[in-house]
From Swiss-Prot:
Pfam family, one: RlmN_N
Name of the protein in question: Dual-specificity RNA methyltransferase RlmN
Radical SAM core domain mapped to chain residues: 106-333
Function: Specifically methylates position 2 of adenine 2503 in 23S rRNA and position 2 of adenine 37 in tRNAs. m2A2503 modification seems to play a crucial role in the proofreading step occurring at the peptidyl transferase center and thus would serve to optimize ribosomal fidelity.
Named cofactor requirement(s): [4Fe-4S] cluster
Reactions catalysed according to its record: adenosine(2503) in 23S rRNA + 2 reduced [2Fe-2S]-[ferredoxin] + 2 S-adenosyl-L-methionine = 2-methyladenosine(2503) in 23S rRNA + 5'-deoxyadenosine + L-methionine + 2 oxidized [2Fe-2S]-[ferredoxin] + S-adenosyl-L-homocysteine; adenosine(37) in tRNA + 2 reduced [2Fe-2S]-[ferredoxin] + 2 S-adenosyl-L-methionine = 2-methyladenosine(37) in tRNA + 5'-deoxyadenosine + L-methionine + 2 oxidized [2Fe-2S]-[ferredoxin] + S-adenosyl-L-homocysteine
Top class in the EC scheme: transferase
Organism (species): Syntrophotalea carbinolica (strain DSM 2380 / NBRC 103641 / GraBd1)
Keywords assigned by UniProt, alphabetized: 4Fe-4S, Cytoplasm, Disulfide bond, Iron, Iron-sulfur, Metal-binding, Methyltransferase, rRNA processing, S-adenosyl-L-methionine, Transferase, tRNA processing
Gene that this polypeptide is encoded by: rlmN
Active site: 99 (proton acceptor), 338 (s-methylcysteine intermediate)
Length: 371
């Protein structure tokens, strides 16, 4: 695909919080309340054409056309799993690609896993995304637009920042994207419905807790520094003792726990000794452990644990009073499971643009219906 076309240099309003959009419009000499109107068109009705904003004057619409634009993401391709999981491939304006995953849940609910970077710098050896390195950060608009695109396929009840990239390596843009997700004039999600996963960037974890409310998940995957250093290079900079201290200091709201993701890898971190060390490591932390059997992929020589080993590991944690859940790995047949995203699909093109536009929901009739 030729991506050499001139870039649109107008300001993308999808990168603005309500406060920033208010100031932008005030700088144009417009009333401050207009920002809320524009926001609601962009996010409640998923409109990206100023001419469709019927409660704005023709003069304002014309001025906005000249100075601003509203970006969108349309899937270049989609791939559907036998279990109902859908993977989206998005091509960004500079030609780079990212993936998002829509995961079906019980009661016709859905969780959306979104990306925060093109590639990833963390280099976790079990993760396919990390094998490509970091290309660039996503903008707030590129993060939020993944949700807007998925809403065209139906409600999204929960959002997890667990796709391509390390969210805390793109902290400023991620915080702004979360603010847009939470705003009543934006996508109006409750922070209770949004979870951010980190490999363990300790200073950014501390900053995150001060700046925005979000459920925290920590990709742990080992109980000793020796093993975690090998699996996750970030541990050489922020070893387990520092990571656990940051977790104990993270501001938790009532009834909330920090989720610790533990990818169980055969003969690497799945022993009885690992289970015992994990109980000790998380002592005193309001914790929930998600046990994730390793999802095998071509870029790794690691193997999945046996069913017997998974049950034994989980059983030990449960017997010692921990909340330990085996997480089902959905979308494995389309490489959409944990650690398998790579920003490339080889599938037939999606439905025609007109069909997708006609399926777009009008979210103006009441707010928060996707929660």
């Amino acid at each position: 695909m030729d991506v050499s076309m001139d870039q649109d240099t107008r300001i993308d309003l999808k990168n603005f919080t309500l406060e920033e959009l208010t100031e932008f419009l005030a700088g144009m000499g417009k009333e401050r309340f207009r920002a809320g109107q524009v926001m609601r068109w962009m996010y409640h009705r998923l409109v990206d054409d100023f001419d469709a904003m019927s409660d704005l004057s023709k003069v304002l619409r014309a001025e906005l056309h000249q100075r601003a634009r509203i970006s969108r993401l349309t899937p270049e391709a989609t791939e559907d799993s036998r279990d109902g999981t859908r993977k989206y491939l998005f091509r960004l304006e500079d030609g780079e690609t990212i993936e998002s995953v829509r995961i079906p849940m019980d009661d016709n609910r859905a969780t959306l896993c979104i990306s925060t970077q093109v590639g990833c710098a963390m280099g976790c050896v079990f993760c396919h995304t990390g094998s490509f390195g970091l290309v660039r950060n996503l903008t707030p608009g590129e993060i939020v637009n993944q949700v807007c695109a998925a809403l065209a396929d139906g409600p999204v009840n929960n959002i997890v920042l667990m796709g391509m990239g390390e969210p805390l390596h793109n902290l400023d843009n991620v915080v702004k994207a979360l603010q847009i997700l939470y705003m009543p004039q934006g996508l109006d999600y409750s922070p209770r419905k949004v979870t951010l996963s980190t490999a363990g960037l300790v200073p950014q974890m501390q900053e995150l807790g001060k700046r925005v409310r979000v459920n925290l998940a920590v990709s742990l995957n080992a109980t000793t520094d020796e093993v975690r250093n090998r699996l996750m290079p970030v541990n050489q900079r922020y070893p387990l003792q520092q990571l656990m201290a940051a977790c104990r200091q993270y501001p938790l709201h009532a009834k909330k726990r920090i989720t610790f993701e533990y990818i169980l890898i055969r003969d690497v971190n799945d022993s009885d000794q690992d289970a015992r060390r994990l109980v000790k490591l998380l002592h005193g932390i309001k914790a929930k452990v998600n046990i994730i059997p390793f999802n095998e992929h071509s870029a790794s020589e690691f193997r999945a644990p046996t069913e017997e080993r998974i049950s034994r590991f989980q059983g030990y944690l449960l017997d010692h009073g921990m909340v330990a859940i085996r997480r089902a790995s959905k979308g494995q047949d389309i490489s959409a499971a944990c650690g398998q995203l790579k920003g490339k699909l080889t599938v037939s093109p999606p439905a025609q643009e007109s069909e997708r536009n006609s399926a777009r929901p009008d979210r103006s009739q009441g707010k928060g219906k996707h929660l």
